[in-house]
């Protein structure tokens, strides 16, 4: 009879792919495949988005090195706080446009992923960040191509931010958090 510990040990050592509905690539060493994922989704110059607390951690440096080794140019944006704010999202959009990026790789916990998703929703939409506020009608966009190709790499467990298109962002004028969403702003993996 297998024990729960043995089942967990086996699961943690396997590479597994599934969808929820976002495709998920799970397993030890899967970060090594980032170059292949970028090639698959035609990302040649991603903006790496993380938070201030994670910018110096080994997994962020490893991600950047793996991209460089795969001949993929990238830039790091680490201006996301533990409670992402609208001004940080605007700064991320400026960095994305200025760097002529063609995709986003979000790495970190729920806040970093939410900040990156908000950047992805708004960077090419031609509208305001708050057009995507959950309680409002879904914005009509001229093209769904306005959403950059998006890869998430969660470094914590719990929020599930890597599997959904919503983002919790603080409105610095109102001093309140709002949920941003667009049904077609999907994470690619």
What name fits each language-model region?
Residues 1-77:
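An N-terminal, well-structured beta->alpha segment
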Residues 25-26, 77-80, 153, 180:
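Hydrophobic residues at beta-strand termini and immediately following loops
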Residues 42-44, 73, 100, 146, ...:
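Short loop/turn motifs at secondary-structure junctions
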Residues 47-48, 103-105, 151:
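Conserved beta-strand elements of the Class I
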Residues 50, 108, 170:
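Short beta-strand/turn micro-motifs composed of small residues
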Residues 55-128:
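N-terminal small/polar loop signature for handling phosphorylated ligands or for N-terminal nucleophile
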Residues 125-187:
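A glycine/threonine-rich phosphate-anchoring loop and its flanking beta-alpha core
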């Amino acid at each position: 009879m297998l024990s729960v510990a043995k089942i967990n040990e086996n699961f943690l050592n396997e590479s597994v792919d599934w969808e929820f509905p976002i495709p998920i690539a799970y397993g030890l060493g899967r970060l090594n495949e980032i170059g292949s994922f970028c090639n698959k989704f035609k990302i040649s110059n991603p903006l790496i988005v993380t938070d201030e607390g994670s910018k110096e951690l080994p997994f962020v440096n490893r991600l950047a090195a793996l991209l460089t080794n795969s001949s993929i140019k990238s830039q790091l944006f680490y201006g996301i706080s533990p409670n992402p704010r609208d001004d940080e999202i605007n700064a991320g959009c400026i960095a994305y446009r200025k760097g002529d990026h063609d995709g986003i790789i979000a790495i970190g916990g729920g806040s970093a992923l939410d900040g990156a998703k908000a950047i992805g929703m708004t960077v090419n939409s031609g509208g305001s960040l708050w057009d995507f506020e959950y309680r409002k009608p879904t914005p009509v966009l001229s093209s769904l191509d306005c959403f950059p190709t998006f890869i998430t790499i969660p470094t914590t467990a719990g929020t599930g931010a890597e599997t959904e298109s919503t983002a919790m962002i603080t409105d610095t004028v109102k001093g309140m958090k709002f949920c941003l969403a667009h049904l077609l702003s999907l994470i690619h993996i």
